[in-house]
Amino acid sequence: LYASESYLQRRPNPNRLSSLEQDDFIGWSEAQQHLQSAQWLEKTLRGRACRLTTSTMSAQFSAVQAGIGMAVLPHFIAQKMGLICLQDNIGCDQPIWLVIHSDLAHSRRNRVVADFLNELVAKEHERLLMP
């Protein structure tokens, strides 16, 4: 769960994370409700609406950076962007998928890129898991 410094400075309960009832959240649009992070928000907010819903991860990052609210974001990206982690283990692990169209799976160029990405993820596995 991440927020920007500007959001934290104006949040209703600056020193209490036990209660998120008055906080603003950036959530997912209807089409992304299958995501673990969307389901966590649904359970946490108990029917309360998000301040903003988006359909892309990049929009969520931009909204958090702008101080609009908090969002469930991947650690390995959010930390590089200078966002502040409020809760590091909320049980929303998301797999990383590499998808290649079946017609292109045997193309030498695509295979080289796919192999490189697989090696990179394997090499950075621990860092991708860490909060």
Locations of regions flagged by a protein language model:
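C-terminal regulatory
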Residues: 2-96, 123-131
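A late-sequence structural motif
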Residues: 89-127
